[in-house]
Amino acid sequence: LALANPVHAPYGRAAVTLLEHLGLLRRKDVPLPGLAKPFPLLSWEEIPWERLTGGVEAYWDATPLRQGKPRFAFVYGENISQTAQLALAATRVGLLALSLAVHESLSGAGAYWLASLGSHLPLEQDYLVLKGRGRPEVLAFYVYVGSPEARAVFRRYGFLLPGE
């Protein structure tokens, strides 16, 4: 199963929490030093993801995912785009961003299932200008991103926008 590495990739964290929500992963009672609560009692937002460097199966029991699949394994992408490539080329199944699943380059590659918003760690994305604030082309891009045309593009690729 291809998924983004949850240690540093937000989509990987959403994938793990989705599998947990569906009952396909169960948290192990493993000690994580320095935490106020035991690992199994932490909310998704409280999990110290950057400290979970042992791989998903060091912290979650994947027995439900293994049933009938003796060769089951997690394959980690460094980001969600690499995870999509792994799903296409190697695993044939993965947990991806909707924006990739509906993209023209993947549209004929298979089917996708849309998870409900409450079934995984939410992913909020922002944009900001780091350099060139005074340049006309930077300002034009900033204005475009908030325009009705750009909002239509975001919706087409599965993004929810503020107020939706």
Regions found by a protein language model. Name each.
Residues 1-164:
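Exported/periplasmic ABC-transporter solute-binding proteins
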